[in-house]
């Protein structure tokens, strides 16, 4: 059932590519294939226009069905939506970038991505999609194997996606400041966005300031902190106070008459950072989308930022992948 509070809209931020991107979207990570089509459809009815997907999430076909249903019913047009997907590491070789993008477009049932992102700054050994898809980090029980493709070659192929109108904007995810500095030295088309883990336990202030100063819009994933990682038996998440239950967050929620989740999302969006939460609860869908209609005080912003512990939950070695991407 769709939300009882439909037709909300999120403000947009301007990308350096010239396109506008909603500052609040719907993230598809860990959305079950069985419910994905309905969740996307209901999110569109609620007012969501940005959907953040990826090859690695394994639910792009289902997400596309939700989009197609909403378009068929006249709720939205394709041009009203901002659809994001990501290039997985097994497809970093320039000869595989365009086929990967076209495959994902076909799964969504669309002709172009509004934003196509390099998911991780590391190439993995190529896996034929006919053999395993999504390829994930490795086959079950095996170690991940790195590829032999430097990022500048991958980025050149990403730029060609823009040339061929398969992607309107291109971006990066999980990149360090050093990698961004290097990329900006050779990029013909600059990345429009940087997507990173960002919440009060991991503020990454230096990285965010550098990216924003260079004209990249920052998108935060895992805005609620440990919440999404508990079911993955992530030790860092299970041993930490949930941000939704933290006294600092709850105090602001009570003051503003909002939910703790809305406070966490507003802490990001008020600082110009896009967010991509998800929910299958109609009321929470609307609440998350409505997380820009109030302002936190400067003191509240500082108090929330002061919760920083440098605590990263999405760290490949923590789930058995032998690549210390973040050191």
Curated annotation (Swiss-Prot):
EC number(s) reported in the record: 1.1.1.307
Gene Ontology BP terms: D-xylose catabolic process
Gene3D superfamilies: NADP-dependent oxidoreductase domain
Binding residues for NAD(+): 173-174, 222-231, 278-288
Record pathway: Carbohydrate metabolism; D-xylose degradation
Keyword vocabulary terms for this entry: Carbohydrate metabolism, NAD, NADP, Oxidoreductase, Xylose metabolism
InterPro entries the record matches: AKR, AKR2D, Aldo/ket_reductase_CS, NADP_OxRdtase_dom, NADP_OxRdtase_dom_sf
Record field: catalytic activity: xylitol + NAD(+) = D-xylose + NADH + H(+); xylitol + NADP(+) = D-xylose + NADPH + H(+)
Binding site for substrate: 119
Active site: 57
Site (Lowers pKa of active site Tyr): 86
GO molecular function: D-xylose reductase (NADPH) activity
Assigned protein family: Belongs to the aldo/keto reductase family.
Function of the protein: Catalyzes the initial reaction in the xylose utilization pathway by reducing D-xylose into xylitol. Xylose is a major component of hemicelluloses such as xylan. Most fungi utilize D-xylose via three enzymatic reactions, xylose reductase (XR), xylitol dehydrogenase (XDH), and xylulokinase, to form xylulose 5-phosphate, which enters pentose phosphate pathway.
Name of the protein this chain belongs to: Probable NAD(P)H-dependent D-xylose reductase xyl1
Organism of derivation: Arthroderma otae (strain ATCC MYA-4605 / CBS 113480) (Microsporum canis)
Record gene name: xyl1
